[in-house]
Amino acid sequence: MSNVRSDKPFTLAGRTFQSRLLVGTGKYRDMEETRLATEASGAEIVTVAVRRTNLGQNAGEPNLLDVLSPDKYTILPNTAGCFDAVEAVRTCRLARELLDGRKSHESRTLVKLEVLADQKTLFPNVIETLKAAEVLVKEGFDVMVYTSDDPIIARQLAEVGCIAVMPLAGLIGTGLGICNPYNLQIILEESKVPVLVDAGVGTASDATIAMEMGCEAVLMNSAIAHAQQPVLMAEAMKHAIVAGRMAYLAGRMPKKLYASASSPLDGLIK
């Protein structure tokens, strides 16, 4: 069948990953819960807010990298808390310095760019995001970018050189799920770079739907960290991602208006 989908490796910045679940490291009760939930998720990429997390810049304080070692995980520094391009670029440069010299040296230019518009909605400021992306790409960063679900902005971010676009499913931390599947579908159909859902996931079914739609991967934090049992939810998310990917590859049955019997009606016993 010509429309059968074949699986392709999940590749970022020249590296191939087995897990299509990326997880954040904030909002947990303590570092031990962070470690346990991350392990249960099966994630290989963990994202870290450089401005809020000690990666070695604060000597004498607990260092997240002692709990989530770069020897085991790909550390994805992000620019959470930045509200303009200048702040975001400065934060990425700091992250590169902090991660330089670690075993994950080969992935130290991989960053997650997010430039926020305001504290209330945490919507991305797409104008400042585009400005920052242009600078970071020129400086050799591999930029994964948090953006709105506007297909035109997603296209422009890919055109300036971002290696992945990460449209929000819903507002950060809301758990509302995929609020605008139509725009997301357009982005998926048009994008020439990997598309990852970022923000808004609330439970396992949200992650599955994103993967069924054709997303390369899903990034989440609050959905796991704010669950009543974060470690158990992390494991649920691991399975949800796999199930969604398999369903996408398998291809769902067509929707029909009228019933269609599972068993043939010919030759019935009379």
From Swiss-Prot:
InterPro entries linked to this entry: Aldolase_TIM (IPR013785), Thiazole_synthase_ThiG (IPR033983), ThiG (IPR008867)
Domain of life: Bacteria
Keyword Metal-binding: no
Compartment(s): Cytoplasm
GO BP terms in the entry: thiamine diphosphate biosynthetic process
Subunit structure: Homotetramer. Forms heterodimers with either ThiH or ThiS.
Name of the protein this chain belongs to: Thiazole synthase
Organism: Pseudomonas putida (strain ATCC 47054 / DSM 6125 / CFBP 8728 / NCIMB 11950 / KT2440)
